[in-house]
Amino acid sequence: MTINYIRYFIFMMLIFVACTKDEYEGPSLQSLYGEFSLLSPFSITNLNPDFSNNEMVKFHCEFNKSVDWKITIRGLQTGSMKEITGFSNRIDSGLVSWNGNTSEVPFFSEETCALELTFLTELDTLRDTLTISGKK
């Protein structure tokens, strides 16, 4: 009878050890319900772009969880606007860039532009400015 208990115990331990997962399925609870924070600041590669020379403006920022984000670029003289949106935990300067185009008319001219990074589900807003030195 004792041998059966030992076998049963060993069998149950093997099942318990065999059924543990090394990786979780789906997103972590931190990324769903955790507090939002920046891991790296919002940075802009070119604060004086000359779009007539095909220069680009690239953006970079990292967060602790995936969020819906939006970069809004607004010309302070013309009122022109460009929006760039995405859902991720990172704005990668290799993927997110601006070449001077617009989302709606009028077009950008040589002017100062206000940049705003906002998040759909968070209260944080990051702001900066750049000056266009050559229009597209």
Language model features with spans:
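Acidic/polar, low-complexity intrinsically disordered N-terminal segments immediately downstream
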Residues: 21-95, 101-114, 120-127, 134-136
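C-terminal motif of bacterial Sec signal peptides marking the signal peptidase cleavage site
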Residues: 15-18
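Sec-dependent signal peptide recognition
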Residues: 4-11
